[in-house]
Amino acid sequence: MANTKSAKKKIKVIRRRTIENKIQKFKMKKAIKEVKKALLSGDIEKAKELYSKAAKLIDQTAAKGVIHKNNASRKKSRLMKLINKYAALSSPQPESKAQ
């Protein structure tokens, strides 16, 4: 346990920041889940719209130092890759000409 007054204050600050970080991380994860849910329901346009909001939250989380910037970039990349995969599956494929 902390002995000095400043150390006790530091514990309070750390607890407050931990809570703020968890809230920010929860918002980010929820946004990602909403995008995935839209994809599973087959609504590609809604998923793309939700992706922009999720990407913004991911960037904010990285800017606040809750997650590393490379982690944020990886999350956005994987999410966009998933959207493109579902978009390719749902769009009709052009027929190739047999030679």
Swiss-Prot record:
The organism sits in which domain of life? Bacteria
- Chain segments annotated as coiled-coil in the UniProt record: none
Q: What keywords is this UniProt entry annotated with?
A: Ribonucleoprotein, Ribosomal protein, RNA-binding, rRNA-binding
Per UniProt, what is one GO molecular function of this protein? Answer: small ribosomal subunit rRNA binding
Q: A biological process (GO) annotation for this entry?
A: translation
> What InterPro entries does the database record attribute to this sequence?
Ribosomal_bS20, Ribosomal_bS20_sf
- Signal peptide bounds: none
Could you name the Gene Ontology cellular component terms for this entry? cytosol; small ribosomal subunit
Q: What does this protein do?
A: Binds directly to 16S ribosomal RNA.
Q: Which family does it belong to?
A: Belongs to the bacterial ribosomal protein bS20 family.
Q: Please give the name of this protein.
A: Small ribosomal subunit protein bS20
Q: What's the gene?
A: rpsT
